[in-house]
A protein has these predicted regions:
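N-terminal structured subdomain of primase-like DNA metabolism proteins
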Residues: 1-96
Length: 96
């Protein structure tokens, strides 16, 4: 069984560095990371946002959204959440 809670907690603690890696054209605006969505031809940052306190994310231009860092990792990688959780756990040195 994958411990999504543990992986998400570790990811939230590391979110600033994860977001800088995953969305390098983004920037912090208050408690959010604002970037272009790399999954579509997004020309201007603004509609794709990640709450750095909770890990919730949304692309307000497409209504795609998720509630935690694992779902963001899955979305960005185009994989399922289980695969993304395992990869994220490995990256963070957390037992899945």
């Amino acid at each position: 069984l994958i411990d999504f809670s543990r992986i998400n907690a570790a990811a939230i603690a590391a979110l600033p560095s994860l977001l800088a890696r995953w969305l390098p054209d983004g920037r912090r605006v208050g408690h959010e990371w604002v970037a272009r969505n790399p999954r579509r031809s997004d020309r201007n940052p603004g509609s794709f946002r990640v709450n750095m306190n909770t890990g919730k994310w949304a692309d307000f231009a497409t209504d795609e959204c998720g509630g935690d860092p694992v779902s963001l990792a899955a979305y960005l990688a185009g994989t399922g959440q289980a695969e993304a959780a395992r990869a994220l756990a490995d990256m963070l040195g957390v037992d899945a």
